[in-house]
């Protein structure tokens, strides 16, 4: 249910007795709040003054509890959309009964449903034994299977996987991918283990998940995340298919992000970074948003900074560079580099592969200070959570913050960015490219055929016959006195009419998904007068979609 702190409408798990007076008080407060005029000239300030943040995260403003942080963002969206959900209910109930139903379903959506904690031994190459800790959280089963990555990091904790699992639920809803949210973590530093040891850990972790019913094509489908990739996903798929999924024809759909030879899909590796690019593209080309932050539309004259040169950071950098933006700085855990004339992503990638670090790159200088505070138009935090906090948010110079990482902005920092009219494109939308293409891979595995294979030659022949028909029509009309009238397509059109490959289909579908979701977020932000608060608009969209599933399915057996 809801509980109020100051002017903030918050969800809590308080008992019914404690909620009766709070419900009556909430209605009165909402009524008074709606009677106040909005400050249209500064939507960010108006929003900040109208809604406050949860006290659950305010006690540690620079290092809030990650899961409570996500719950706080959920609360903001729920407080805005509750009345609409009540109004849209088509049940033969009183207003009070409808409101109780809505609040009850919102209470179901918010918590993390299942958290599995594991410990298992492995024998290392030197003969010693080590106990490995791991977790898998399933936030919601409103849609199945659950979906979320597996990360290898010493920072993995129960709180982190719960937060990331809940983000996955809302992320999938924002981009209309029919999955519930999940996340897994293994508490290791992969740099301290050999490839043989990592394979042991990955395969044993897979078996532990399988024994507990936490993996399967229709149950729970992991994917790559921090410090994991195609190699680890291939080990997982092989382990599952060789054991518990031995008789399941869909066994390799138990995980996504696999190599092509193991049922993977073209475009998955770059999917999250490409999605970040498309997400930025949709807002940077929108004149109304650019005028609010004092920028001109388009990438042409824009500079950007990337924090984190991993999979997401690298591919985000590549696509922005390709479309005319200039990368002036890149930050990693061991240091940062700077070049106001621009850094070429391919050259930097080659240097990092050869030397193991971006430091020492000959075409850039070391950057002293925080890379998050570097002078640029677009800041892309693509590392870990809680990087932008109350302490450094006032010094951020970027006008657009594109959240490539999960949860990089704390609630207090988010509030400061709204007050400063900085456009934050939220993680719950922006880095959804990975799960979107994972969905395409999952469908490919269930259908047992690659995209384009059944139609590639048919489309190519159809387009060829169309051009020949046009040519023959022109020759019949004007004759052949000067010879034939060849129809010569341009290079771009020739590539298009040759037939869509799997990669073409994936890229096109991803671009469309990000565009459609961006339009939904813009519409919601305008509808509720949220100004630049795209995060709350995205959460409102997610809550509406998840709520509809629960409401129409019924909650008797939920």
UniProtKB/Swiss-Prot annotation:
User: Which residues are listed for substrate binding in this entry?
Assistant: 84
Q: Tell me which EC number(s) this protein carries.
A: 1.4.1.3
Positions modified as ADP-ribosylcysteine? 172
This protein's source sits in the domain of life called Eukaryota
Task: Report the principal subcellular site.
Answer: mitochondrion
Q: Where is the catalytic site?
A: 183
Molecular function via GO:
glutamate dehydrogenase (NAD+) activity; glutamate dehydrogenase (NADP+) activity
Keywords recorded for this protein, A-Z = ADP-ribosylation, Mitochondrion, NADP, Oxidoreductase, Transit peptide
Query: Where found in the cell?
Result: Mitochondrion matrix
Give the record's PTM text: Stoichiometry shows that ADP-ribosylation occurs in one subunit per catalytically active homohexamer.
Judged by the first EC level, this protein's enzyme class is: oxidoreductase
Pfam families the UniProt entry points to: ELFV_dehydrog (PF00208), ELFV_dehydrog_N (PF02812)
Which reaction is the catalytic activity of this chain? L-glutamate + NAD(+) + H2O = 2-oxoglutarate + NH4(+) + NADH + H(+); L-glutamate + NADP(+) + H2O = 2-oxoglutarate + NH4(+) + NADPH + H(+)
The record's listing under InterPro entries reads: Aminoacid_DH-like_N_sf, Glu/Leu/Phe/Val/Trp_DH, Glu/Leu/Phe/Val/Trp_DH_C, Glu/Leu/Phe/Val/Trp_DH_dimer, Glu/Leu/Phe/Val_DH_AS, NAD(P)-bd_dom_sf, NAD_bind_Glu_DH
One cellular component (GO) term of this entry: mitochondrial matrix
One GO term (biological process):
glutamate catabolic process
Q: Which SUPFAM superfamilies match?
A: Aminoacid dehydrogenase-like, N-terminal domain, NAD(P)-binding Rossmann-fold domains
The organelle targeting sequence, given as a residue range: 1-53
Family classification: Belongs to the Glu/Leu/Phe/Val dehydrogenases family.
Q: Tell me how this protein assembles.
A: Homohexamer.
Q: What does this protein do?
A: Important for recycling the chief excitatory neurotransmitter, glutamate, during neurotransmission.
Query: What name does UniProt use for this protein?
Result: Glutamate dehydrogenase 2, mitochondrial
């Amino acid at each position: 249910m809801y509980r109020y702190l100051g002017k903030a409408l918050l969800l809590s798990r308080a008992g019914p007795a404690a909620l009766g007076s709070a419900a009556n008080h909430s209605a009165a407060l909402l009524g008074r709040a709606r009677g106040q005029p909005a400050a249209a000239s500064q939507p960010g300030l108006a929003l900040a003054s109208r809604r406050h943040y949860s006290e659950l995260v305010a006690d540690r403003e620079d290092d809030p509890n990650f899961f409570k942080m996500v719950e706080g963002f959920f609360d903001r969206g729920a407080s805005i959309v509750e009345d609409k959900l009540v109004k849209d209910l088509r049940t033969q109930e009183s207003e009070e009964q409808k409101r109780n139903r809505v609040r009850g379903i919102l209470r179901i959506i918010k918590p993390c449903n299942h958290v599995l904690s594991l410990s298992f031994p492995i024998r290392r190459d030197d003969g010693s034994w080590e106990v490995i800790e791991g977790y898998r959280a399933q936030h919601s089963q409103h849609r199945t299977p659950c979906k979320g990555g597996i990360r290898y990091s010493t920072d993995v904790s129960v709180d982190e996987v719960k937060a990331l699992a809940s983000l996955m639920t809302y992320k999938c809803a924002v981009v209309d991918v029919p999955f519930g949210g999940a996340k897994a973590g293994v508490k290791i530093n992969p740099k301290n283990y050999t490839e043989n040891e990592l394979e042991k850990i990955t395969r044993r972790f897979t078996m532990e998940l399988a024994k507990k019913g936490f993996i399967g094509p229709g149950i729970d489908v992991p994917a790559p995340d921090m410090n994991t990739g195609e190699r680890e996903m291939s080990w997982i798929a092989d382990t599952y298919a060789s054991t518990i999924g031995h008789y399941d024809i869909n066994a390799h759909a138990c995980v996504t992000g696999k190599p092509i030879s193991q049922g993977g899909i073209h475009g998955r590796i770059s999917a999250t970074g490409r999605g970040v690019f498309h997400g930025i593209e949709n807002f940077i080309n929108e004149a109304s948003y650019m005028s609010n932050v004092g920028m001109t539309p388009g990438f042409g004259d824009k500079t950007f900074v990337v924090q984190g040169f991993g999979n997401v950071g690298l591919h985000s950098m590549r696509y922005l560079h390709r479309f005319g933006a200039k990368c002036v700085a890149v930050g990693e855990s061991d240091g940062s580099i700077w070049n106001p004339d621009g850094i070429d992503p391919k050259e930097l990638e080659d240097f990092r592969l050869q030397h193991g670090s971006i430091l020492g790159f000959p075409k850039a200088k070391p950057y002293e200070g925080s890379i998050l505070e570097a002078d640029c138009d677009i800041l892309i935090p693509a590392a870990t959570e809680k990087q932008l906090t109350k302490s450094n948010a006032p010094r951020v110079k970027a006008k657009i913050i594109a959240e490539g990482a999960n949860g990089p902005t704390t609630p207090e920092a988010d509030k400061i960015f709204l007050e400063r009219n900085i456009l934050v494109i939220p993680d719950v939308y922006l880095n959804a490219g990975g799960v979107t293409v994972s969905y395409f891979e999952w469908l490919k595995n269930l259908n047992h055929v690659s995209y384009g294979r059944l139609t590639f030659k048919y489309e190519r022949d159809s387009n060829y016959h169309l051009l020949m028909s046009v040519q023959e029509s022109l020759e019949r009309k004007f004759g052949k006195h000067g010879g034939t009238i060849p129809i010569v397509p341009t290079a771009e059109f020739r590539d298009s009419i040759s037939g869509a490959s799997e990669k073409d289909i994936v890229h096109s579908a991803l671009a469309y998904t990000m565009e459609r979701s961006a339009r939904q977020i813009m519409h919601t932000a305008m509808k509720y007068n949220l100004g630049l608060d795209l995060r709350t608009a995205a959460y409102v969209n997610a809550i509406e979609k998840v709520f509809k599933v629960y409401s129409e399915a019924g909650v008797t057996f939920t």
